[in-house]
Each structure stands twice: as C-alpha cells, then as structure tokens.
C-alpha cells in the first residue's frame, strides 16, 4: 500500500481529496478500451458525473469503469518525482512514507493516462484502418469492374450513335454514368492513399486480381444507367430497401444477430456491486413500508367520502348534461349568425378586408390552409402557431400541478379552470364526470412528467439503475448472459442488446442507416409510412450513440457519445416523446421546452442546463421560432424534426429558424416528405443536406418544371420522356438520404390487419343543390371569375355548402332567429339537410349495432359542432378534440379512448388529430371532408391503421358528387402521382385531368346512367365498384337489337363489338366523356375481366389512316390498369363518330345485362365475379339464355331524382349510381372473410336505405394500382416489335425456297436456315462482342427451363467474361440479357451494315431472339395460311384466334406487331381487314 501526502498547508481543503476508494481507483481501476477510444480516468476522479450515462454518483463511475473491458492501467509511482526527504515536513521524516506534491502527482497520473490512451487509440486506429482498407479494396474492385463494363457498352453503342438518335441519347447517358464512376474512383483512390499512410505502407500494397475483375460482379447500386439498362437488378435493389432488408447505401441487414457473451466483470468490483444492491434493497423496503402506511390512511378517508360522492353523482351528471345542451344550443345560434355574416363577406372586393375580423369563421383556419392547392403559405404555419400560443395560456395554471411532486396534486385537482370551459370548447358525454370531479383526474394516467425538474430526474434514474442491478443479478444466477449481447456495427457503434432485439427487422435496418449517415456527417429523411415506428428507431439510434461513447468527428471531437439533442415536434405529441424516451432508454434527461413542461424557472436556463448535461430537449415549432436566439446560441449535436414537413415552405420563418443550427446531423421524420410539389421536397432536403439539390431557382428550372409538366394530360411525348429522365436523376440523387418503407412492404413483419379504403360519393340534397346552384349563379362568383374578387372566399363557401348548407345559409327561419319551440327538422344543422350527414347517420347506426368504434374527422370546427349536436341527439357516447382543446388535455383524451371501449365515436379536426396520434382503439374511420393536401387526409387515416391495430380497418372518405370536393379529390390524386413519380416510380402515369378556374365553380348532377367525373377519369383502373344502370340497359338493348329481357345477342356482333374497342380507333375522346363512363361501367371494364378479354380489349389497333395512332385507345392496360384516358383532353382530338360511341357503349352489353338480371348474393358476387364473368364472356350465347331474368324496372317518373336510382342485388337503391370494389379482393386471405363480409353488409345497407350515396370508389386502387405512363409503354412496345420484325426478316432470308426441297430448321431437325457451328472469327472487321448460341446444343427441355427461370441460367449483361467463354451458354429469348440488348439496339443494327455482309454471316450469327418471336410467327402464319382468305384476316378472325392466347403483358406488343406486320383497311361494309405486307408474304 502506498500513500500520498501533501505538504502544502495553505490548501487544507485539498488534504482529503483522494479518499481510500479513489486511491484504490488510481492503483487498480481499469481503463476500458471501447472502439478505439480510452476513457479518461482522471475525469472519474475529478468529476461527479459518470461517463456511463448521465449518472450522478461517483460509485456509478467506478462501476461503469469496471465494465469497460479487461485492459488494466497501473499507475507507476516511480515515474512521478517524490518530495526529497530533506524537504519533507519534520513530522513526516523518519516514517518511511513517500510524499508527493499534489500538482506533480496529478500531472504525472494524467500524463500516464494520456500516454496509455494514445497507445490504445493508435492500436484501435490501425485495426479500424485495416478493416476499412479491405472495404476500400472491395469498392475499388467493384468500381473498376463497373467502368470496364460501361466501356464495353460505349464501344458497342458508338458506331451506331451517329445514325440513330435514340442510341445517341442512350450513349450520352452512359457517358454521364461513366463520369460519375470515374469521380467515385478518384474518391476511393484518395481514401486508399490516406489509409496507406495510416498503416505505414507495410504489407498494404495489395495488387488487384485482374482475373477476379473478369468475374461476374454486380453494380454497387441502381443509377440512371440501371434505370435504362438494368431493370431487373434495380427492381431487386429497391425491393430490398422497401422491405427493410438493406439500407439505401447498400448495406444488407444481417440475417441473424450474432450472440456475443458478455465480458466477465472484474473481481475488484464485485464486492462493491453487492454493496450497492444491498443498499438499494434496504432503501426499497423502507419506502415500501412508508407507502403502505400512507395507502392505509388514504383508504380510510376515501371510504368515508365515497358514499356521499355516489349519492350526488347522478344529480351532478344530469346538471352537467343540461348545462352542456344549453351551451350547444347557444353555440348553434352563434354559428347561424356567423353564416349570415359570411355570406356578405364572400362578396367583398379583392384588397379589402372584413370589417369585423373577430367574427371570422373559425373553421377557415382549419379548413383552408392549403386552398391554393399547389404551394403552402406562411398563413398555415402561423395559424397553427397562434393556436398553440392561444391555448398555452389556458393550460398553464392547469398543467403546472401535474409536473410537481405528488404531494401537491391533491390540492390542485379540486380546481376547475374557468378558461377551459368557454363557448368554443364543450366537454363530451364522457368528459363531464371528470369535469365535476376535477379536470386533472384523467391526466394522471396518461401524462408523463418530463425531466425539467432535476431532482425528479435523479430519482427516476436511481430507480432505473436499481432495477437494472436486480435484473442483472437474476441473470448472473441463471448464467444467462447471452441474452443481452449488444448489436455491434462498423467503427465501434453499439446498440444495447435488450433494446435492439425488440425492434422489427426493418427498424433495425433504419438504425443501421442512421449510423451510416452519422459516419458521413450527413442528415437524412426517415420517411417511413405513418405508423411504422419512426420514433422508436430514432430513440434506439440515440441510445446507441450514448452507449457507444464514440467521439464525433464532425464536431471537433467535443462530444463523446451523444451530445445535446433537440427534437422539434407538434405540441400534441411532445409528451408522447417523453413517454417513449422514458420507456426505451431512461438514462436520457428529457425536458419539454413549452408551457406544458415541468420546468418552472426561466426557459433560457432550461436550455442551458440541457446542453450542459447532454440531454434531450423537446419543443414545438412555435417555440423554435419564438426562442430562436436562445436556442441557436448553443452548439447542438443532433437536430430532429418530427413531422418535418412543417418546414416545407422554404421562406417561412420557422423553416429559416430550423436551418440555422450549426450541426451536420439533421434528421427529419415525416410520413409524407412530399405533399404538394417538388418545391417542398427541396426545402426538406436543404435542411438535412444543404446544397445537395442546389439553389431553389436552379432546382425549380431544371427539375421541378420538367417533371411537373410531364405529368399533365396534354404533355407531349418529348415532355413525358424528359420528365422520366429528370425523375430518374432526381430519385438517384436523393435515394441514399431518404429511407421510405411502406406498410404494404413490411406488412408480414408487422402482422398488420387489412385496410379497406373507399370513397363514397354522396348526392346533394335538394336544399344543398339549390343553395349551391344559387351561389354559383351569384354575382360573387361572377366577380371571382372576372378577377375582381379573391377565389379563396368562394372556395370556402362552396366547401361549407358541401358539408352542410346551414353553415352558409344560416338554416331555416334565419331572419327572425330560431325559436325555442321550432320543429326538429328546422333546427340549425339538422342532419337531413346534408347528403353526407345522411350517409353518416346510416353508417353510425350500422356500426353501433356491430360494436365497431369510429374516428370521425372534419376540417372545420364548425362542422364538428354540428356533428357533436347530432351525436348527442342520437345518444352516442363520444369524445371530442379540436384546436381549442388544451395541449395538456389531449393525451389523456387519446389514452381514455383507447382504453375505454364503451366510447363509440371520437370527433377530431383533421389537423389536430392527424399528427402522431395513436388511436388504434378504433377500427372505422370517416373523413368527412377532403383537404387540398393529400397527406392531411392520409395522416388522419393512419391514426388507426398502425402498429398495435388488431382489427381490420375500414376508411370511408365522403365526397359530394359533381361539386368542388370532387375537384379537390382530383387535385389530391395529381399530387400523389407527382410524389410517386419522384419517390417511387419515374414511369408513374400522367394524371389525365387539368382544371381551370371555371371548372371549380361548376355543378354537375350525375345520375345512374352518367356516373361521376371521377369514374370517367379513372375508368379501367379496377377501382370502380360497379352497379347496373337501367338507362344504359335500355340503350344497349336497342343497339344490340334485343328485347328488354336481355336475350342472346347475335353471335356475329359479339366479337365485332369487342373489335371496336380493341382495334378501331375512335376519332377523339372528348365527345365520349360520358359514354365511356357508362360503357366502362360493366363488369368487364373493371377488375373482373378475363385475361383474354382484357388483353384483347387493348391488343389491336384498327387505323382509319396511316398516320393515326392508338394512344387514347389505351383506356385500360393489360392488367386492368389505367394507362390513358379517353375522357380528358377535349381539345387535342377530333370529335367521335356516333357509330364508334355506340359500339363502345355496347361492347359488353351481354355481360352487363346478365349482371343486371341475375340475382346473386353479395358475398358470392364479390368473391366469384371473376370466374363467372370469364365464362359468360366467352359463352354468352348459351349461358345467357338459361339465366333467370328479372322484369324490367318501371318507366321513369317525372321526378328525375327518383327515376335515376340504380338497382343493386335486384333492389332499387336511392341515390346510387355505381359501386367500385378493390381489384385484389380475390387474393386476400381467408381469415379476413368475416371483416370483408361486414364491409359488404355496410355497403349493402347504404344502398338499400334512403341515403345520399351516389357511388363508391376504391381509393387504394387509384393510388397504388396505376400502370406506367402510356407513352413510355407504347415506345417500349414499338421498340420490341421493331426488333422482333427485324429478327424475323433476317431469319426468313436464311431459309431456302420451296424449290430446294430442303426442310426448314425447327430447333431440332431440318437444314434450311439452321445455324452452323461457330466459326473462328479472328480477322473479321465487325466487332464480335456478343456471345453466340449454338441452338443444337440446347434441348427443348433445357430451352423451356431457361424460359421459365430467366436469368438464373444466363450470364449477366455486365459479366466481363470473354466471348469465347460463353460459346455454348448463350441466353434464351426470355432472358434479361436478350431484352436489354434488344431494347438498346446493340445487336441488330450492326448486322444490317450491308446485305452482302449479312448474307455471308447469316448462318453463322443468328439474331438474338426475344420472347415475342413465337407470337410473331404464329400471327404471320395465321394471317398467311389459316384465315378465310390467305394473306389477310379480319379483326373478328384475329380476335377469335388469339383472344385466349394473349397474356396481359403481351397486349401492347401484340398491337405493335400487328400494325407493323400488316396494312389495315376497311371494306365498304365497315369490316376491318389486316393484310400482310409484301415482305412477309
């Protein structure tokens, strides 16, 4: 044992600075090496803050230090100069002790610690450098291989680029890719040199194995080149990212986390740990005894007061109910007066403001934040901030008690704040008991106190440490150490094992991606779909940083582990973040910078304290703006924006405030990173990675404008292709920094139930229709259209009328004010005067009977009030939350609804209840009115369909047909398509609808025969839930020449009618806007067509002139998806002929009549419609005669409202026009059959009741089921057809004529045209860079297997192998190689250099076939020999022959093949004839 003595008597307070515990620590304490960094032992001795988490005890420091690792650092006292014996104090001389000067001793100890740290750091750095060097070598090899492959492509394309403009564009793109690879190679080389310098050059110069570079290596990632030449690999790459198996940087997630045993603890610390555990156990027992005594006393008091409370409870409840009813009635009168004032306000000229701003309807702020539809405004953010600030004062008195110690709460619970109960906030039926017993009663359950109070934080941390020690002792006794093995990543990053193993696999991948961003000193957008646990991924990553104790390079190494972190989020979810942090990683000190926080002193001091202790500060977007100077004064390690799309306006004050943090570590969490336009995406990316997308003007000019313009219906082919290329480049640029997984991709991991989302088009009531039409015809709208008035007020008025006419007109008897004794129907806001409320009434009645629970969202608080009155009148239990609900009250309401299953409805405004709120207690969602911003409605939907939901979720979006709401829905779809084009699929088809100002102020009244404008736009997408139409039935019967019983049509008409849709080109679509709606409303035009019918419906093209095309004919692609619309562009095409319209309308008349007249149960119709219609379409001559018929409906009455109702399941349904159903209905699991039947029952009841349901649309089928853009598909089909024809022409030239008597090569036998063995090709002038196949080397079985397995048996395109190595292993016609070469014109043009050269080498070098060769040969042979007239065939003959042979994917190619193979003309009788061209006869 040694001693240190300090002779300096002038500092007596420092005499005992080294107690025995610390002296032992000097001597024996291990200095742990973790990940290349050695902790400073001196800090543990001189500070009370433990490096292992934010513990505050020195004992915890020692405990943490002993866990660091087995490496020990012994302090060598002999290296520290001691005080000479002659210089020692007299009383110490002769005692034989060593005396040290304190300053010298501390300096010596620190020098030894620093030296040890430096040595350990060097060792770790070398180890990391060696590991990183191996990775660099792999990257270098991969990059070099890619460059060689690209050079081969350039060599193949260069000779043809001068003569072929298409190939020239591809060559330019490949050269750009080569430039990118060269830049990447430079960076890799520089990194290699840096690592070589670190390693000292010893054994580092590893020569690249050139032979290995010739092996088959894949590209390191998808790119623009991959988008064009490597579709198969790109799809696989994106699928791995979407399903959470790989990060965007290409790092795959390990299949199974390696179990690593925990390091054995040192014996020196075991006794100390036991002491801590004993003390903790004693303390726990003492507190338990005290708590038991307090509980007993409290129970006596409660039992005495419970009797009196029970006796008065009934009287109190009845009193509150009557008071609430009076308040509701008073508020209704107030809304009536505001409605009258609003009517005058609508007509104000532009530039003038209302005289009384205080009477501005409150719903406007909630409703029209995105009215412009294209770009957000400062008003939206400012409005939310004002809302937060306004309610903050209401909640300050009520909240402060919650976050104080428990003993102070009892006093505060008795206080009922007067500010919360005003004219704008009404407690629901479930809140009234709480209001009488004390407003704070419910908050104790859900609210989680933050760590603003440091004493509370220390107490909570001690509890957590005690529990950890107890749990660890249990594991040690059971010898179960492997369960907590940490998850280790590159460069020493570790996540605690108990935390990491609780994450889903895709969440683990998200943590890995966040670490990759951290290493690159870059930010990112975690854009997982709402409800996939973005919060948990962030907490796990931050916990890993704190746990790993890694120095951050980008912060000058000033932060060890995790530095101060700030999280900005909506006020509704601030305390939800606190709860999640305390649950998943309690060591963090998490404080809320807001009025609802527990910190009672100055906010500036709280910020300073959190920065000092490296804690987590949670605040709102309004506080970021208000306290910008105080917050940005400090250096923050991480800045995280929850619901980061709040900064989508690049010029807003809150956006500029968020972008002033001095840190590269910026993370955005957003389930909808792009909502309206590309300008918003730029704003988000400029926050996480400033400069990545350049400046905003350049980005808008080079990317936003081309991509947006290419998405409109009237875009030219050049604009469409330009938009595609720009979208590819933009997607490749942002992909590494945007991680987005969808629920549909990770559904199996989450075990999420199914979601059924439908759009119910509701008919206006007579009163609504009258008010709507009167307003459209008014002078106010006239002034808007002339530019004299602002459009904003007019749109607000239209939306109010759609919700409820009383919101605009003030209701009946508004002149004299509503009397007290008025009739129920004449009350303000009565539900029978609104078409959508009639539907809501029926839905709620059915769901209440079924025991479902409902979320009811509305944009407007005024509408929410009317719905509240409606719920109270029908005696439904409910809760309500809107902008006036205090921040402190929101989380308790959410918790109460999730836990109390007796509450039926939760009323919410979309903006308040749509962000970060978890309402999985509900399984039915009604979105009462749409928002211009599609993500707003999506956020509301995701409140129920998220992790934790166990039941199937049904979502109904309510829209009024033919009104402004339908236009809003169209705008939502356009924005969603634009988002998909950038984030998902650059080939996303265009949205075939563009509104102008005049269209917004129109009203259409679609009936059963017309359908809605939406049904016309999205015809063929498989979204329509069809219902028969009596008007259409009569018309088609007349066209077909049949009686009303829908007897068998003439056999000759059936294929001819189909041929009209299939081959004959209508002159235009503008005149068929309505007829297409009716013509495609039969079962075959939806998602129930057979493959043959669907393929044939778009397969052929009968042209009236040589220059015409079939673009607009592609109403439906081969898989039933919408490729182009015949209803949109009314100006670009000539009018339609009457005969064509009739034929289109009657194409499937037989099947439609069959559907009308056959009574089938609804479940059978939904499940088995596909097979039924398939058989009926092909054999309608026999089956339609035997089907039981129902009588025709009666003649239409004078009242058009009632005469146009359609029939469903044989029953007339009021207000029904048609119904759509989800096209993948038949593929759902059998386990969801009960839920589906429940939804079907609801729809059936809606159609049977006298409700305002007009039609039903599947929203998911429109958003997710869209096919690629028609122009891109047609261009691809044309290229494939041209290549196939060239291959056929070359093959024909190789065959001998009939006079030779030589059999033609069949693949097995024959001589004529058979390729000879591969000749020695040395000395030839042509470039022989492609493999040659000897067909005789492949048997038929082998060829069939290769066709099925595709690329499994074929070499990769970028294989790098020599040509001779693949002589006998050439790919089949169905392989990816053949498709890529055919698509990029890398084979055939060089074989057409000259006829002589081609004839000389035709036998030796056969053309590389495609998968359409057999189809082309069959078509040619049929038309040449098997039709009624050799050499030509009618459309009907072609249909009958190939209808059953065509697959869905072959439809477009088949049409192009036919048009290139034959010439088309019509006979005098109108029959279409296809005649072989001379070169193919």
Curated annotation (Swiss-Prot):
- What ranges does the record list as Acidic residues composition bias? 378-390, 420-435
- PTM annotation: Phosphorylated in a cell cycle-dependent manner at Ser-158 by cyclin A-CDK2 in response to DNA damage. Phosphorylation at this site promotes the intramolecular interaction of the N-terminal domain with the helicase ATP-binding domain, thereby probably releasing the inhibitory effect of the N-terminal domain on its ATPase activity. Phosphorylation is essential for its chromatin remodeling activity.
Q: Which reaction equation describes what this protein catalyses?
A: ATP + H2O = ADP + phosphate + H(+)
Residues covered by region (Winged-helix domain (WHD)): 1417-1481
Q: What's a Pfam family in this record?
A: Helicase_C
Q: Which residues carry this modification: N6-methylated lysine?
A: 170, 298, 444, 1047
| Sites bearing Phosphoserine, chain numbering | 158, 428-429, 482, 485
Q: Where is this cross-link: Glycyl lysine isopeptide (Lys-Gly) (interchain with G-Cter in SUMO2)?
A: 256
Region entry Essential for its interaction with RNA polymerase II, transcription-coupled nucleotide excision repair activity, association with chromatin after UV irradiation and for mediating the UV-induced translocation of ERRC8 to the nuclear matrix, spans = 1434-1481
Q: Keyword set for this entry?
A: ATP-binding, Chromosome, DNA damage, DNA repair, DNA-binding, Helicase, Hydrolase, Isopeptide bond, Methylation, Neurogenesis, Nucleotide-binding, Nucleus, Phosphoprotein, Transcription, Transcription regulation, Ubl conjugation
Note down the stretches annotated as region N-terminal domain: 1-506
Q: Residue limits of the Helicase C-terminal domain?
A: 839-998
Q: Where is this region: Ubiquitin-binding domain (UBD)?
A: 1387-1416
**Protein's UniProt keywords contain Hydrolase:** yes
Matching entries from SMART domains are given as: DEXDc (SM00487), HELICc (SM00490)
Placement of sequence motif CSA-interacting motif (CIM)? 1373-1385
Q: Where is the composition biased (Basic residues)?
A: 327-337, 1192-1201
Q: Name one GO molecular function term.
A: ATP hydrolysis activity
The record, for InterPro entries, names: Helicase_ATP-bd, Helicase_C-like, P-loop_NTPase, SNF2-like_sf, SNF2/RAD54-like_C, SNF2_N, SNF2_RAD54_helicase_repair
The short sequence motif called DEAH box sits at 642-645
Subunit structure of this chain's protein: Homodimer. Binds DNA. Interacts with ERCC8. Interacts with RNA polymerase II; interaction is enhanced by UV irradiation. Component of the B-WICH complex, at least composed of SMARCA5/SNF2H, BAZ1B/WSTF, SF3B1, DEK, MYO1C, ERCC6, MYBBP1A and DDX21. Interacts with KIAA1530/UVSSA. Interacts with ELOA and CUL5; the interaction is induced by DNA damaging agents or by inhibitors of RNA polymerase II elongation. Interacts (via WHD region) with RIF1. Interacts with SMARCC2/BAF170, SMARCB1/BAF47 and the neuron-specific chromatin remodeling complex (nBAF complex).
The function of this protein is: Essential factor involved in transcription-coupled nucleotide excision repair (TC-NER), a process during which RNA polymerase II-blocking lesions are rapidly removed from the transcribed strand of active genes. Plays a central role in the initiation of the TC-NER process: specifically recognizes and binds RNA polymerase II stalled at a lesion, and mediates recruitment of ERCC8/CSA, initiating DNA damage excision by TFIIH recruitment.
Query: What is the UniProt domain comment for this protein?
Result: The CSA-interacting motif (CIM) mediates interaction and recruitment of ERCC8/CSA. A C-terminal ubiquitin-binding domain (UBD) is essential for transcription-coupled nucleotide excision repair activity, interaction with RNA polymerase II, association with chromatin after UV irradiation and for mediating the UV-induced translocation of ERRC8 to the nuclear matrix.
Q: What's this protein's family per the entry? A: Belongs to the SNF2/RAD54 helicase family.
This one is known as DNA excision repair protein ERCC-6
Q: Which organism is it from?
A: Mus musculus (Mouse)
Which gene name does the record give? Ercc6
């Amino acid at each position: 044992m040694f001693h240190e003595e300090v002779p300096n008597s002038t500092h007596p307070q420092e005499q005992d600075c080294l107690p025995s515990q610390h002296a032992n620590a000097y001597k024996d304490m291990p200095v742990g090496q973790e990940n290349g960094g050695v902790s400073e032992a001196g800090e543990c001795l001189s500070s009370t803050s433990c490096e292992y988490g934010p513990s505050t005890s020195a004992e915890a420091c020692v405990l943490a230090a002993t866990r660091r690792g087995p490496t020990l650092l012994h302090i060598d006292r002999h290296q520290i100069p001691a005080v000479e014996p002659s210089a020692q104090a007299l009383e110490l001389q002769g005692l034989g002790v060593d005396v040290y000067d304190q300053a010298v001793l501390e300096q010596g100890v620190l020098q030894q610690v620093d030296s040890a740290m430096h040595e350990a750091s060097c060792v770790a750095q070398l180890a990391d450098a060696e590991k990183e060097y191996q990775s660099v070598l792999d990257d270098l090899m991969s990059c070099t291989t890619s460059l060689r492959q690209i050079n081969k492509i350039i060599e193949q394309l260069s000779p043809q680029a001068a003569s072929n403009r298409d190939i020239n564009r591809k060559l330019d793109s490949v050269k750009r890719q080569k430039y990118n690879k060269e830049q990447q190679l430079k960076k890799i080389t520089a990194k290699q040199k840096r690592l070589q310098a670190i390693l000292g050059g010893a054994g580092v110069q590893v020569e690249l194995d050139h032979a290995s570079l010739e092996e088959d290596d894949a590209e390191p990632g998808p790119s623009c080149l991959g988008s064009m030449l490597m579709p198969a690999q790109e799809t696989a790459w994106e699928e791995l990212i979407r399903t959470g198996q790989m990060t965007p940087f290409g790092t795959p997630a390990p299949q199974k986390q390696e179990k690593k045993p925990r390091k054995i603890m040192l014996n020196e610390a075991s006794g100390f740990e036991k002491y801590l555990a004993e003390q903790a156990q004693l303390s726990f027992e003492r507190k338990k005894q005290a708590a038991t005594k307090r509980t007993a006393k409290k129970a006596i008091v409660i039992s005495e007061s419970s009797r009196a409370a029970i006796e008065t409870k009934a009287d109190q409840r009845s009193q509150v109910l009557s008071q609430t009813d009076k308040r509701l009635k008073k508020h209704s009168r107030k809304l009536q007066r505001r409605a009258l004032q609003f009517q005058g306000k609508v007509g104000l000229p532009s530039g003038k403001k209302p005289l009384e701003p205080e009477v501005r309807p409150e719903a406007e702020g909630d409703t029209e934040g995105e009215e412009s539809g294209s770009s957000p405004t400062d008003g939206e953010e400012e409005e939310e901030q004002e809302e937060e600030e306004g309610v903050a004062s209401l909640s300050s008195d009520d909240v402060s008690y919650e976050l104080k110690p428990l003993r102070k709460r009892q006093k505060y619970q008795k206080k009922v704040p007067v500010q919360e109960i005003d004219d704008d906030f009404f407690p629901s039926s479930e809140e009234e008991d709480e209001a009488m017993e004390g407003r704070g009663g419910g908050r104790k359950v859900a609210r989680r106190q933050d760590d603003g109070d440091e004493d509370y934080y220390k107490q909570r941390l001690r509890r957590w440490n005690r529990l950890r020690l107890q749990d660890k002792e249990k594991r040690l006794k059971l010898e179960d150490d492997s369960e907590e093995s940490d998850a280790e990543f590159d460069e020493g990053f570790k996540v605690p094992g108990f935390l990491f193993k609780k994450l889903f696999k895709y969440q683990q991948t998200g943590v890995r991606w966040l670490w990759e961003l951290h290493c690159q000193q870059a930010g990112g957008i975690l854009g997982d779909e709402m409800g996939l646990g973005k919060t948990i991924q962030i907490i796990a990553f931050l916990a890993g940083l704190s746990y790993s104790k890694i120095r951050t390079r980008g912060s000058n190494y000033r932060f060890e582990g995790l530095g101060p972190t700030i999280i900005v989020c909506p006020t509704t979810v601030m305390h939800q973040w606190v709860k999640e942090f305390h649950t998943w990683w309690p060591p963090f000190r998490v404080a809320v910078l807001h009025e609802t926080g527990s910190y009672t002193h100055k906010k500036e001091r709280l910020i300073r304290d959190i920065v000092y202790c490296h804690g987590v500060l949670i605040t709102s977007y309004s506080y970021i703006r208000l306290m910008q100077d105080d917050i940005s004064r400090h250096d923050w390690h991480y800045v995280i924006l929850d619901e980061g799309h709040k900064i989508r306006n690049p010029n807003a004050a809150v956006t500029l405030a968020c972008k002033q943090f001095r840190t590269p570590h910026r993370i955005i969490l957003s389930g909808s990173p792009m909502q309206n336009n590309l300008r918003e995406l730029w704003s988000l990316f400029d926050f996480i990675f400033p400069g990545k997308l350049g400046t905003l003007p350049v980005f808008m000019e080079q990317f936003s404008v081309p991509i947006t313009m290419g998405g409109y219906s009237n875009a030219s082919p050049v604009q469409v292709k330009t938009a595609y290329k720009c979208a590819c480049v933009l997607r490749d640029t942002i992909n590494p920094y945007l991680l987005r997984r969808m629920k549909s991709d990770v559904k199996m991991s989450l075990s999420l139930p199914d979601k059924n989302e439908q759009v119910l088009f509701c008919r206006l009531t007579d009163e609504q229709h009258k008010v709507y039409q009167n307003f459209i015809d008014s002078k106010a709208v006239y002034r808007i259209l002339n530019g004299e008035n602002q459009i904003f007020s007019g749109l607000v008025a239209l939306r109010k009328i759609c919700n409820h006419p009383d919101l605009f007109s003030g209701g009946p008897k508004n002149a004299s004010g509503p009397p007290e004794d008025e009739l129920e129907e004449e009350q303000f806001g009565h539900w029978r005067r609104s078409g959508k409320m009639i539907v809501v009434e029926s839905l709620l009645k059915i769901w209440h009977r079924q025991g479902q629970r409902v979320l009811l969202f509305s944009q407007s608080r005024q509408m929410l009030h009317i719905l509240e009155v409606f719920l109270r009148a029908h005696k439904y239990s409910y809760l309500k939350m809107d902008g006036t609900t205090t921040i402190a009250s929101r989380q308790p309401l959410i918790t109460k609804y999730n836990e109390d299953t007796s509450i039926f409805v939760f009323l919410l405004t979309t903006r308040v209840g749509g962000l970060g709120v978890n309402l999985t207690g509900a399984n039915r969602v009604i979105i009462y009115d749409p928002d211009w911003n599609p993500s707003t409605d999506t956020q509301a939907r995701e409140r129920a369909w998220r992790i934790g939901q166990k039941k199937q979720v049904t979502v109904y979006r309510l829209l009024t047909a033919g009104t402004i709401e339908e236009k809003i829905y169209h705008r939502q779809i356009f924005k969603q398509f634009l988002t998909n084009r950038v984030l998902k699929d650059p080939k996303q088809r265009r949205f075939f609808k563009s509104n102008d100002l005049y269209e917004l102020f129109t009203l259409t009244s679609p009936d059963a025969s017309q359908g809605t404008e939406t049904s016309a736009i999205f015809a063929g997408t498989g979204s329509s839930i069809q219902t028969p139409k009596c008007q259409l039935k009569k018309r088609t019967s007349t066209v077909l020449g049949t009686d009303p019983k829908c007897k068998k049509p003439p056999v000759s008409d059936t294929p001819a009618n189909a041929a009209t849709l299939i081959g004959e080109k209508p002159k235009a679509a503008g005149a068929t806007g309505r007829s297409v709606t009716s013509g495609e409303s039969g079962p075959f035009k939806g998602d129930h067509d057979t493959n043959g019918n669907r393929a044939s419906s778009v397969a052929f093209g009968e042209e009236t002139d040589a220059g015409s095309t079939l673009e607009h004919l592609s109403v439906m692609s081969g898989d039933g998806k919408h490729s182009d619309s015949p209803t949109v562009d009314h100006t670009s095409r000539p009018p339609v002929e009457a005969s064509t319209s009739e034929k289109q309308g009657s194409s499937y008349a037989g099947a439609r009549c069959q559907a009308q007249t056959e009574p089938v149960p609804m479940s059978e119709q939904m499940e088995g419609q596909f097979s039924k219609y398939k058989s009926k379409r092909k054999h309608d001559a026999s089956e339609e005669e035997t089907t039981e018929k129902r009588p025709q409906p009666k003649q239409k009455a004078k009242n058009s409202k009632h005469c146009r109702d359609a029939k469903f399941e044989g029953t007339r349904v009021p207000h029904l026009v048609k119904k759509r159903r989800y096209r993948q209905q038949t593929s759902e699991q059998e386990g969801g059959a009960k839920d589906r039947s429940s939804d079907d029952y609801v729809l059936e009841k809606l159609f049977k009741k006298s409700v305002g349901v007009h039609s039903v649309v599947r929203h998911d089928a429109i958003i997710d089921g869209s096919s690629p853009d028609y122009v891109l598909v047609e261009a691809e089909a044309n290229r494939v057809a041209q290549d196939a024809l060239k291959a056929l022409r070359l093959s024909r030239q190789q065959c001998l004529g009939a006079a030779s008597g030589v059999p033609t090569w069949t693949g097995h036998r024959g001589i004529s045209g058979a390729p000879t063995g591969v000749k020695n090709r040395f000395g030839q002038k042509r470039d022989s860079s492609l493999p040659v196949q000897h067909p005789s080397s492949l048997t038929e079985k082998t060829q069939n297997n290769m066709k099925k397995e595709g690329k499994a048996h074929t070499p990769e395109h970028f294989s790098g192998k020599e040509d001779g190595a693949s002589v006998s292993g050439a790919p089949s016609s169905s392989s990816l190689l053949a498709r890529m070469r055919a698509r990029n014109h890398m084979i055939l043009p060089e074989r057409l250099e000259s006829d002589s050269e081609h004839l000389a080498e035709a036998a030796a070098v056969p053309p590389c076939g495609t998968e359409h060769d057999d189809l082309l040969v069959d078509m040619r042979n049929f038309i040449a020999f098997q039709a009624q007239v050799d050499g030509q065939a009618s459309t009907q003959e072609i249909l009958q022959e190939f209808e059953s042979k065509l697959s869905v994917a072959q439809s477009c190619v088949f049409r192009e093949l036919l048009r290139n193979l034959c010439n088309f003309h019509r006979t005098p009788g109108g029959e279409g004839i296809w005649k072989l061209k001379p070169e193919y006869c």
